[in-house]
Curated annotation (Swiss-Prot):
GO biological process: indole alkaloid biosynthetic process
PANTHER family reported in the protein's UniProt record: NADH OXIDOREDUCTASE-RELATED, NADPH DEHYDROGENASE 2-RELATED
Pathway: Alkaloid biosynthesis; ergot alkaloid biosynthesis
Family to which the UniProt record says this protein belongs: Belongs to the NADH:flavin oxidoreductase/NADH oxidase family.
Domain of life: Eukaryota
Stated name of the protein: Chanoclavine-I aldehyde reductase ifgG
The entry's keywords: Alkaloid metabolism, Flavoprotein, FMN, NADP, Oxidoreductase
Purpose: Chanoclavine-I aldehyde reductase; part of the gene cluster that mediates the biosynthesis of isofumigaclavines, fungal ergot alkaloids. The tryptophan dimethylallyltransferase ifgA catalyzes the first step of ergot alkaloid biosynthesis by condensing dimethylallyl diphosphate (DMAP) and tryptophan to form 4-dimethylallyl-L-tryptophan. The second step is catalyzed by the methyltransferase ifgB that methylates 4-dimethylallyl-L-tryptophan in the presence of S-adenosyl-L-methionine, resulting in the formation of N-methyl-dimethylallyl-L-tryptophan.
Pfam families named in the record: Oxidored_FMN
Amino acid sequence: MTIIPKHPSPTLFKPLALGKCQLQHRIVMSPTTRYRADEAAVPLPFVKEYYAQRASDPGALLITEATNICPNSVGEAHIPGIWSKTQCEAWREVVSQVHAKECYIFCQIYATGRSADPELLASRGFEQVSSSAVAAEPGCQPPRALDEEEIQKYISDYAQAARNAIEVGFDGVEIHGANGYLIDQFTQASCNQRTDEWGGDIPNRARFALQVTMAVINAIGPDRVGMKLSPWSQYSGMGIMGDLVPQFEYLILQLRQLGIAYLHLANSRWLDQMTTHPDPNHLTFVKVWGRSLPVILAGGYDATSAPEVIEMVYADYDNVAIGFGRYFTSTPDLPFRMKNGIALQKYDRSSFYTCLTKTGYLDYPYSPEYLCRSS
């Protein structure tokens, strides 16, 4: 269904200070994996055009697809990395294109842990690892639990990836602590069965996420760091523990005290039929985060629901931004359309993950109205 904005949202188009960035509106391009990197995890040459297309409205924030921090963090083929010189140079071109359009861009950095394809890892000489030897799904082979030295190495790899991102010009990094990847595997008791300082209770399960965050802060500064969490997501065996709410309340409170640039809360919808969550607009955790630092909300918002959430649910908050993922893929001029009441374009989900091709990636047009304005 094509979604047409009812009317421009005044709050959605208010400026927002986010770390070192002065956003001119509160529409954010959320991270979306699209498998457009080569076998060496280097973004393909046309990736820079994709991000440049979506840097269509000056002062916007774009967040890249999930980007691997080191070779052993890679969970799937054709996902980009940011550890090698060649990868970094490709990202430098992306950043340059986005900055030329007067927009901001953060690099989302992550490690997959037990969500990685074990055959891919084995072909590259690595093992599937996690916080504990707990399989993501029944019948799957359990990963190996990381030891202390390996945990510390991952923490330092996150910090180095952040340094690499800033060196090539990114405005900051978003630490991916969501969707059942490695940080989430430490945070949630459904996976983390450790009895040492990295597990066993709420503070210990939050320790890895916080140690990674502090290492990244020490590397690049708190005002260049965001964190993405998805407390309600049940992807990859997550979101089913009894103390989920107090676990994430504790983690979010600690992140707030670290003074990072923003918190990103996502209700991930990886299946077409997944449309509801216990707390679809994240109120439980936004109340903990508070009103002083920016929070990005994502999870299936469209041209109707985004203004409603920011104008009604969060009428008393002046720190909320809305993330769009799939609609930003299909609608490169999304902010312009939202502001001018122009329908967002339908997306073709079947082409989102077609590896290495421009189809479903670069072939969504701008609106005629946007092209007239630009000319």
